[in-house]
C-alpha cells in the first residue's frame, strides 16, 4: 500500500530485485531487455522486451539465470528490498512446464 491505496503493478526489474531473484536491478533490466523473461498472465504468454513492463500478483515468470531455469508465481509486489525472508514471501516457485 502506498498512501493507503493498494499497489496494483510493479516494473519487472524492480520486482525481480525486491524479490532477490537477481542481485542487481541492472541485471534484471538486462534480462528483460534481452527478452529472456517470459510472463504468463491470464493464460497468455508474452516474452518481455523492456524493463518497464509490469507484473501483477498472479502473474507467472520464467527466466534462465546462471545456467538455471527459474519459474515463479508473483504473490505480492513488495515496497522495498527487504531481508531474504521478506523477499521469499513475494513469490512461490512453480514447475517450469
Predicted segments with their positions:
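Strongly charged
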Residues: 2-18, 29-30, 38-97
